[in-house]
């Protein structure tokens, strides 16, 4: 299957899975997580896997830029590292714009002033271009930030694909367990991050190998 067909298959599957989750699964899973799991600390810890990645990517790119100005020419593995960082930062930039565009409320209320949520207010839905942190649930930034670099590393280091698969699964489990995101947010963030990672890697790594 060539890249165009894979892209089309991804779009079709996203167009099916995300609306299906929003309509049939999101509220039930959030309600179950809130009532049964009570946000265990282990779930919160799993979401922290993502936290160091954006600042680390920014620092690595800044250092790489300074090194290039000093005459350094990166080899293949250095290009992999740079590509991973670029994919991550591109993905989270796009994610922020999509959060604003979709304006989805959160599963729970944790902001001041009070943000409307499913658990507290039975608020559920999208208010397009609303803006504000209380309307930023979709897509999941955590899943976007973990799947973008993983998509690059999946191609560059195929021997470690078990690790690359495990990382987003762990983050997703943490997000569901902590009731930080609806399942639909998680699916959407996964597609976004993967698309950014595959796209950046297809250009940068293929060009480097040429």
Predicted feature descriptions by range:
Residues 2-3, 8, 118-210:
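Membrane-embedded catalytic cores of phosphoryl/pyrophosphoryl-handling enzymes
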Residues 1-64, 99-111, 115-119, 129:
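N-terminal transmembrane-helix/juxtamembrane module of multi-pass inner/ER membrane proteins
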Residues 11-16, 56, 84-92, 190, ...:
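Alpha-helical transmembrane spans of integral membrane proteins, capturing the lipid-embedded, hydrophobic core
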Residues 60-71, 146-154:
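Hydrophobic, aromatic-rich transmembrane alpha-helices
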Residues 6-11, 79-84, 186:
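Residue-level signature of transmembrane alpha-helical entry/exit and packing/kink sites
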Residues 16-23, 88-97, 168-180:
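Aromatic-anchored segments of alpha-helical transmembrane domains
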Residues 23, 27, 92-96, 100, ...:
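Transmembrane alpha-helical segments of multi-pass membrane transport proteins and ion-pumping complexes
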Residues 65-101:
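Interfacial segments of alpha-helical transmembrane regions
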